[in-house]
Swiss-Prot record:
UniProt keyword annotation of Transcription regulation present: yes
Protein species of origin: Haemophilus influenzae (strain ATCC 51907 / DSM 11121 / KW20 / Rd)
Gene3D superfamilies xref list: lambda repressor-like DNA-binding domains
Protein name: Uncharacterized HTH-type transcriptional regulator HI_0666.1
Feature: DNA-binding region: 59-78
Presence of keyword DNA-binding: yes
Length: 102
C-alpha cells in the first residue's frame, strides 16, 4: 500500500510539473501575441510592404495576385487607414500575414 501511495505521489508531482510547463508556455505565447499587436497603422503598412519585399514580390505581381491596383497598394503601404479594410485584409492574407491570432 505504501508503494502505491508513493507512486501516486510521484505521478501527482509529475502532473504538477507538466501543468507548470503548460502555464509557462501559454504565458510566453500570450506575451508574443501582445508584442505583435498593431498600435500604429502607418507602421503596419510599412510592415506589410517590408514583408512583400522580403518575399521578393513586385507591386505588379501583387496587383495580379490580389486584383488591387498599384496605386491602392502604394496608399495601403503608406497609410492603411486610407484603404478599405477588406483590401487590407486581402493583401495581408496574400502576403501570409494574419490579422487575427485567435
Amino acid at each position: 500500500m505504501d508503494n502505491l501511495s508513493a507512486q501516486l505521489e510521484n505521478q501527482i508531482d509529475e502532473l504538477k510539473k507538466l501543468q507548470k510547463s503548460v502555464i509557462t508556455y501559454e504565458q510566453a505565447q500570450r506575451q508574443q501575441l501582445y508584442a505583435g499587436k498593431i498600435t500604429d497603422l502607418k507602421a503596419f503598412g510599412k510592415m506589410l510592404n517590408d514583408k512583400r519585399k522580403s518575399l521578393g514580390i513586385e507591386l505588379s505581381m501583387l496587383e495580379l495576385q490580389t486584383g488591387v491596383s498599384i496605386s491602392t497598394l502604394n496608399r495601403l503601404f503608406q497609410d492603411p487607414s486610407q484603404v478599405r479594410f477588406t483590401t487590407v485584409f486581402l493583401v495581408a492574407q496574400t502576403l501570409g500575414v494574419s490579422l487575427c491570432a485567435i
